[in-house]
From Swiss-Prot:
Positions in coiled-coil regions: 161-503, 672-901, 946-1010
A Pfam family that the UniProt record links to this protein: SMC_hinge
InterPro entries associated with the record: P-loop_NTPase, RecF/RecN/SMC_N, SMC, SMC_hinge, SMC_hinge_sf, SMC_prok
Spans through the membrane: none
HAMAP family: Smc_prok
UniProt domain SMC hinge: residue ranges: 518-630
Alphabetic keyword roster: ATP-binding, Coiled coil, Cytoplasm, DNA-binding, Nucleotide-binding
Domain of life: Bacteria
Subunit structure: Homodimer.
Protein name: Chromosome partition protein Smc
Amino acid sequence: MHLKCLEIERFKSFGPYTRIPLLEGFTVVSGPNGSGKSNIIDALLFALGLSTSRGMRAEKLSDLIHQGAAKGEVAVTVTFALDAAAGGGELTVCRRLKVNGPNSTSSYQLNGSPCTLTDLHEELARHHIYPEGYNVVLQGDVTGIIAMPARERREIIDELAGVAEFDRKIEAARRELGEVEVRSDRIQAVVSELLEQMERLQKERAKAEEYRKLRAELGELALWEHLLSVRSLEAQIAQITSQLAAAEAVLAGFDREAEALAERCEQALDELDTANTRVKAMGENEQVALRTQMASVQAQRAQAEAALADLAQQQRQAQGRQQQLELELGELALTLTGFSRRQQDQQALVAQWTARLESDRQVLETSRNDLEQLSASSRRWVEEQSQLRRRLDQLQSEHDPLQRTLDRLGDRLVQATGEGERHREELARIEAGHAQLATEAKVAQERLAAARTRLEQTRADLEAERAQILADRTTQRRLEKERTEKARELDRLETQRQVWREAEGSRATQEVLGSGIQGVHGLISQLGRVEAQYQGALEVAAGNRLNNVVVEDDAVAAQAIELLKSRRAGRATFLPLNKLRSGRYLERLHEEGAIGYALDLIEFDRRYEAAFVQVFGDTVVFRSLELARRQLGRYRMVTMAGELLEKSGAMTGGSLDARRGGSGFALSEPPELAEMRARLGDLDRLLATLAERLERREQRAHELQSAAEAAQRELVAIENRAEQLGREHSTQQARATQLRVFLDSCQVGLEADRQEQADLAARLGPLREQIVQVREELAKLEQSDNHHRWQQSQQHLRELETEVRRWELQLRHAEADLQKSHLDEQLAQEKRQNLLSRRLDWEDQKVEFGQREEESRTRLAEFDRVIAELAAQVAELEERLVDIKRERDRLEAHGRALQQRQGQLNLQREQERLHQGQRAAALAAAQERLDELGPPAEDVPPPPEDLSLEQLQATRLRKQRRLEALEPVNMLAIEEYDRTAERQGELSEKLATLQRERSELLLRIEDCDTLKRSAFMQAFDAVNTHFQSLFAELSDGDGHLALEDPDNPFAGGLTLVAHPRGKQVRRLEAMSGGEKSLTALSFIFALQRYRPSPFYAFDEVDMFLDGANVERLAKMVRQQANSTQFLVVSLRRPMIERADRAIGVTLARAGHSQVLGVKLAADAS
């Protein structure tokens, strides 16, 4: 796209109609000063709407009319030639201005159709022509860049990067965020109120539900108690009555049994004394000694039996070893006997084979002598046979090669015929498979195109997701940095506030606060917060009582006082919470100027209310002294200015000294701290949301990466398949061609082989006849008797030689076996001698075992004899004592049983008499209680079976006490709580939704800010790169763009830093006029290179440059004109010489500008 034509009607210095054709390349407009050459540029700006009238060097619109007429019409038409990529053709823009005194109308047309300026700018933007761009550079634009503030210079980059669009989106999101926050705050306030109401109703509701439940339970328990009481009393009366009757019978039986037991006890004692006397007389001590002796002997006998058993076990083990030894000796005897027999047999066999071998050797020698005699007599016959054999071999040597050749030809013909058939079948299959391969190749190409599309789409999605991840990570890093800075600043401010608070109070109060005494809460000034506007008034109202120390109880106060005494730290006033009156009643204030009670203007914990009442009482805060004086004597008052008016009429006032380190109320948290905390909360939520979104996007990117890899593998597989199909098709084509050539050559070869086969058959016929004839003659010769005998002799000689070699081998094997047998026999004899030695040892051991056994049995017999004698003595004594002792033991046990029973009987009789009196009293009381209760109600539900009356009464008493403790009760709280909870739940859901929307909007704002920064830095880096190369080309120096605040570029401006050749590095403000122009032009060219346009127009931008710099500028324009159209207004020779063509502008006699075209030499050549 380029400017094709400019048509001007009555615009500034131009007359009724002027048409200026324009061509691509580099065009210079030149002419005398005041001739109107710059008006061509102004006309271009006017038509395209790229500047205001002031930008076109006109104070008002009427100045744009030819010769400044008050009335008239101006029209400028610009025609663009479109490129083929844009559809070709032309784009025509026309602007008309009608001025009628103070009134004027301006209209635009686009390709002959009316349009608005916005429509025109949108159409021009599609062709990279922007109102804020640098398509047209006027005389003041270069100096404007030099003079403009750094922030405005940075805003040029903002325009290029599209920052305004991001700002618009951010502003829209912030407006929406404000609306969301307003709705959220409104709902939050309602929810807070509902939560406070629910907290109150929750307690009342639980109390009411418990009260209602207890009343129902108590009613039911009362009915059960009456029923169980009646049942219990009736059962008790029946039981006591039966017990009284049974007890009378039991008491009578006890009396009778006691008399009988007394008589039996006396009789049993007499009998026991008689039995004891008899036992002592019979010798019980002697029997005990005999039994002890017998037990000792029995123990010794048991030891002897154990030793005998051990000996028997050893004998059995030794006998087992002896039996095993005898078995081994028997086996060895049999083995040795076998060795003897085997050796005899082997010796006989060796002798037999030796004799046979000698005999066969003699026969062999005889046969050899006979064969030599037979060979001497048959020599002539052998010579004839040899000649025939040689003749036969010669014929056979001629015949066999020819026959083999003939056989090979036959085989080759058969093989070639078979191969030809197979190749014809293969060629038919290949030709039939061509169509299928073509279809498969087409399908493979379609699949390949689809796979490439899927892969490109997946990669595009992956790149987009990665770009989003990169943007999110950038936002995350920026927010984390901001959070760190905010948290550090917040910590610093809070530390300052804490240090200030810790410095409050006197030495005495500081000693108490730092002592660590349990129950010390703090100073009044530390336990309350006030707003800044009320701080002075409230501190005057409290006075020195701000340093009063609030403690848990009077014991803590006493402990603190003793501490101050011991440390001589001074005095302090303590406010024990357990002794202060916590109630307060303050009348409603209606007096003019009264702000409120001091207590209502302080924020404090409700548990410290009594302490703050003690300090402030009913003090009222008034706006001014004048208004407070009207109420003097009615209230204790303090004014906002710090005057104090007592009820007694005393007034205190004057100037207030600035507080320097003294104690005072803590101010409510400053707004900047609250905003900082809120921002930190927002940052935490945004970072959490960003982390979740990053996780989701990374998971999505991972899935897309896997999908891309799968698509890549699929694409590779399809490409491989397509290539394989192509290779198969090419291979089959080559194979078909090869088969056709082979079949043709095979046919020729078959014909030649058949001819050669016929020739060989003709040559073989005579040879076969000669071979048959020679064989017949040889057969006749070999049928003679001499030949037969000679053959038999040779055969017999070979058999004898074989037999002799076989017998020699057998003889060597037999001798080896005999030697091995002798060796085995020697080993067996050695083992037998060892076993015989062990058998002699066992005989000695057996004799020893017999002797030890005899000794053990002798000792056992002696022990048995002693035991028998002792047993006889014990038996004799037992026969005499057993009967008497048995009778004594029986009598003793019987006497003890009678005495025990007598004592138990007396105790039971006394207890039963006591119980009888108790039963009679209980019967009377139960009957009286039953009469008082009366009969139970009929409709009472049955109580649990395992519930006793005592358990029920205890439960009823406990519930009754709980019920009384709950009163009074609001029973309507149950329904009110449910309604409030339902409303709170609905609002909480709405609030959660709004919070999510708020987080999304905040994140959208941060995303836009990140993208805005990224777009700006991308544009800045690109423009900076272009600026460095352009400045180096224009000035032979180096320079760069510098941001005043690189960390936050939008908070500062943009500076041009240049280093002209031979000079130190300078900023724009310190340069000369020419250096400033070159630097500004480099900046303009860098902007143009970043956002290229189809044409550029310069209006005398070289006016402040010297000849050398104009030459460099003209050279640069000449280079860029190769790809972009340039229209330059200039009076400088280097610029004109570098141009492709020139347009001359002069002032005609009629006072309007006249345009002449000049074709330069460069263009002509």
